[in-house]
């Protein structure tokens, strides 16, 4: 009987993603192929799902969009692609998704969500406010004879 339930669940996963092709596409992008109820979609195209049959911590997930802010994100997904209003629902800080209870506007929340820019030319690099302990040696500018 348990084997029948496992096979039934596997068949639901394949059909829930639109057949074998859709199942493989989702599996290779996310390394997981869960089936759940669609809770909502943000303005960037990320889709958020929930399945209460899964254990806590894996019962909510996101399927990322293939393009965000002009960047192709089909294979290059990043956790910072989730906007703050969905972040709090995704990490179980609240039980109400932003589709039912919108996030209150705050000054520090941007209207257009950005990626994490660490390791890119746009990253923030603070300038040093202290003198260096060791100074670099600058060779003389006159050429040797």
UniProtKB/Swiss-Prot annotation:
Gene Ontology CC: one annotated term: mitochondrial inner membrane
Keyword terms of this UniProt record: Acetylation, Disease variant, Electron transport, Membrane, Mitochondrion, Mitochondrion inner membrane, Primary mitochondrial disease, Respiratory chain, Transport
N-acetylmethionine: residues bearing it: 1
Transmembrane segments: none
GO terms classed as biological process: aerobic respiration; mitochondrial ATP synthesis coupled electron transport; proton motive force-driven mitochondrial ATP synthesis
Protein topology in the membrane: Peripheral membrane protein
InterPro entries to which the protein is assigned, alphabetical: NDUFA12 (IPR007763)
Disease: Mitochondrial complex I deficiency, nuclear type 23: A form of mitochondrial complex I deficiency, the most common biochemical signature of mitochondrial disorders, a group of highly heterogeneous conditions characterized by defective oxidative phosphorylation, which collectively affects 1 in 5-10000 live births. Clinical disorders have variable severity, ranging from lethal neonatal disease to adult-onset neurodegenerative disorders.
Family: Belongs to the complex I NDUFA12 subunit family.
Subunit (UniProt): Complex I is composed of 45 different subunits.
Function: Accessory subunit of the mitochondrial membrane respiratory chain NADH dehydrogenase (Complex I), that is believed not to be involved in catalysis. Complex I functions in the transfer of electrons from NADH to the respiratory chain. The immediate electron acceptor for the enzyme is believed to be ubiquinone.
Protein name: NADH dehydrogenase [ubiquinone] 1 alpha subcomplex subunit 12
Organism field: Homo sapiens (Human)
Source lineage: Eukaryota, Metazoa, Chordata, Craniata, Vertebrata
């Amino acid at each position: 009987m348990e084997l029948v339930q496992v096979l039934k669940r596997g068949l639901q996963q394949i059909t829930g993603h639109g057949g074998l092709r859709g199942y493989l596409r989702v599996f290779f992008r996310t390394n997981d192929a869960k089936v759940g109820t669609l809770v909502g979609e943000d303005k960037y195209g990320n889709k958020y799902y929930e399945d209460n049959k899964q254990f806590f911590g894996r019962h909510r997930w996101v399927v990322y969009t293939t393009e965000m802010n002009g960047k192709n994100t089909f294979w290059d997904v990043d956790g910072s692609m989730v906007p703050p209003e969905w972040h709090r629902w995704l990490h179980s800080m609240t039980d109400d998704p932003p589709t039912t209870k919108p996030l209150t506007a705050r000054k520090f929340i941007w209207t257009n969500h950005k990626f994490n820019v660490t390791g890119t030319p746009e990253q923030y690099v603070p300038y040093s406010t202290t003198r260096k302990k060791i100074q670099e040696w600058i060779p003389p500018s006159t050429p040797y004879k």
